[in-house]
A protein has these predicted regions:
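Hydrophobic membrane-insertion alpha-helices, especially the h-region
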Residues: 25-43
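Aromatic (tryptophan-biased) beta-strands that constitute blades/sheets of beta-rich domains
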Residues: 47-66, 89, 93-102, 132-138, ...
């Protein structure tokens, strides 16, 4: 009998132990689930929170601020005018500066490299993240200039009956001219040119007139061993039904061509081929991109635009209505920044409007600062 009673107590104890273990497991699972839910809700709130006000953290006086121009640069901006250029960090502090005297300066930046060209003149200044920039001159009036991360500069020059695209390394003491691509009247007039970040490729959009009809021709040039043929030309394509007004590299091997009502994605700059396109019924009012996204604002009516953002392979990630009066749009750090004369807004790529505010003062440029929110 005692052995049976002892066994029954053992069974009861074992069952109690199983119940406690099961209860502990259930409580643990419940705690994990609750913590996961709290984390998800907190993270969702954090990435989708909206702001209706702002606080001034940094303020810097800019002499002749209304005459200054701005472009994105490295981890801040470039501020430039007729008598000089200044690199500014996200706190508004000057990082480096350079002086010159130009009638119509136009700047371009890639990484820490900057070029400022005197449009219509013959002088250029190039900088590599420091004050001691270098100056150089070309033989003909400058139409456009752009720079690579290494400091290689592509310059479009206008001659009497033709145009020339020349590649320079201004930081070399000898043989600064690396390559020269002459064009003639039959090739058309270069509307826009861009240089790859590594300086190995150039894409140029030309405006041509054939049988009285305007059309676009896009040419791809490569300066590696692959492009060592006549004029370094490795590919070209005619767009008969649309005018290409802007060309932009997305990294070293991908290019986006913007037309009146669509954009076209090209890849492989050694053997260029069109990888995708998006065409719209509405006219493109603004266009913007980074290495991973292409965005457009389409004109819906006089007051409203439609903002669409796509990945580099053409997948749509954003489709939302915005005001149509924005004069500057850019994408930075996974957010879209828009501004007009006195109004600015920030959208996340998931469509959430992070910030929307009308300011008391006139906006010259809108760019991301130190990201704490």
């Amino acid at each position: 009998m005692e052995s049976l009673i002892g066994r029954s107590f053992d069974v009861i104890a074992l069952n109690e132990q199983k119940k406690k273990k099961r209860k502990f497991i259930l409580i643990t699972i419940a705690v994990i689930f609750v913590c996961a839910a709290i984390f998800y809700l907190g993270f969702h709130w954090f990435v989708n929170r909206k702001y209706s006000s702002y606080k001034v953290e940094y303020s810097t006086y800019v002499k002749d601020g209304n005459s200054m121009k701005y472009i994105a640069y490295d981890d801040g901006i470039i501020r430039y005018g007729r008598d000089g250029v200044t690199a500014v960090d996200r706190k508004g502090q000057s990082v480096w500066s350079g002086s010159y005297d130009m009638a119509e300066p136009k700047a371009d930046a890639c990484g820490s490299s900057v070029v400022v060209a005197d449009i219509g003149g013959k002088d250029l200044f190039a900088y590599k993240g420091e004050d001691t920039g270098v100056s150089f001159s070309v033989d003909y009036p400058i139409v456009q200039a752009c720079i690579s991360e290494q400091g290689v500069v592509a310059v479009v020059m206008e001659e009497n009956s033709s145009n020339t695209i020349a590649l320079y390394d201004p930081f070399q003491k000898s043989e600064q001219l690396l390559a020269e691509i002459p064009t003639n009247v039959e090739d058309g007039y270069p509307v826009d040119v861009d240089l790859s970040p590594d300086g190995s490729s150039v894409v140029a959009a030309y405006l041509c007139v054939t049988a009285g009809t305007a059309q676009s021709r896009v040419a791809f040039y490569n300066f590696t061993d692959v492009g060592k043929n006549a004029n370094c030309l490795v590919g070209a394509h005619n767009y008969n039904d649309t005018l290409i007004s802007k060309v932009s590299f997305m990294g070293n091997s991908d290019v986006c061509l913007f037309g009146e009502s669509g954009f076209y994605l090209w890849t492989n700059m050694k053997q260029p081929k069109q990888a995708g396109k998006k065409e719209f019924k509405e006219e493109i009012q603004s266009a913007f991109l980074d290495d991973a996204h292409v965005g457009v604002i389409l004109q819906k009516n006089s007051d409203t635009g439609l903002m669409k953002v796509y990945t580099a392979d053409g997948a749509e990630v954003l489709n939302t209505s915005v005001a149509s009066d924005y004069t500057n749009v850019q994408i930075a750090g996974g957010e879209i920044l828009l501004c007009s004369t006195t109004h600015c807004a920030v959208y996340r790529l998931n469509g959430v409007k992070k910030f929307d505010k009308t300011l008391k003062s006139q906006i010259s440029y809108f760019f991301p600062a130190n990201k704490t929110n």
